[in-house]
């Protein structure tokens, strides 16, 4: 990457799924512009990287910020996903048992969304945007109306206290259930 930058072929570069050690080693060779990792209310493990990102002035691109759609509150324990075509069929947060555990979080998002004239997805994204100015969520969508809805999350304002309140709720293990990846996909990660 350093050679490509020096040759003028690229101006910035980033890495995905990086932990602190990988990030520091890469940055020592060629300054990293951004790191892309999974991050959402359901998966906050990479928050431990935030001090390093601030120290090194690296942006954070958050993929799956809506936890594969769970935080949109559009699904429930009766939702079915085709095992042949929809990877959510194998994701633990979409089991009936997980929905029972996550119901409190979903209700909380719906209530806050009603109070803010927003959607649960917008609250989830606004929470992320309020965390740090260098976080850029990249929610995936196939539908135009979801694209517009997600974009409008930038207009939803959460106070510092509201963000802390959400964090306190998320810190209680009883309120969040689901894991990062299904076992069949873990083997592809080093």
Q: What does each of the following model-derived ranges do?
A:
Residues 45-84, 119:
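Aromatic-lined glycan-binding groove of carbohydrate-active enzymes
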Residues 9-12, 110-126:
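Acyl activation and transfer enzymes in specialized metabolism, enriched
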Residues 1, 30-33, 51-54, 77-82, ...:
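Short, hinge-like loop/turn segments at secondary-structure boundaries
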Residues 19, 39-45, 64-71, 127, ...:
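Glycine-rich beta-alpha junction loops
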Residues 1-41, 48, 58-59:
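Glycine/proline-rich, positively charged
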Residues 55-56, 83-111, 115, 130, ...:
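Terminal-tail/helix-coil boundary detector
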Residues 15-16, 64, 118, 137-140:
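Active-site-adjacent beta-strand anchor residues
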Residues 13, 35, 53, 60-63, ...:
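Conserved, mostly hydrophobic/aromatic
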């Amino acid at each position: 990457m350093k050679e490509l930058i020096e040759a003028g072929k690229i101006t910035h570069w980033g890495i995905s799924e990086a932990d602190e050690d990988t990030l520091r080693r890469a940055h020592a060779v060629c300054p990293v512009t951004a790191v892309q990792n999974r991050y959402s209310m359901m998966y906050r493990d990479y928050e431990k990287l935030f001090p390093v990102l601030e120290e090194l002035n690296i942006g954070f691109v958050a993929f799956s910020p809506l936890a594969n759609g769970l935080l949109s509150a559009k699904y429930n324990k009766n939702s079915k996903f085709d095992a042949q075509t929809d990877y959510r069929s194998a994701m633990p947060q979409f089991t009936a048992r997980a929905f029972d555990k996550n119901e409190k979080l979903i209700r909380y998002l719906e209530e806050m969304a009603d109070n803010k004239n927003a959607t649960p997805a917008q609250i989830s994204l606004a929470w992320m945007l309020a965390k740090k100015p260098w976080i850029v969520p990249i929610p995936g969508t196939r539908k135009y109306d979801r694209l517009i809805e997600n974009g409008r999350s930038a207009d939803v304002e959460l106070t510092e206290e509201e963000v802390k309140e959400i964090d306190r709720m998320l810190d209680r293990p009883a309120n969040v259930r689901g894991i990062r990846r299904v076992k069949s996909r873990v083997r592809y990660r080093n």
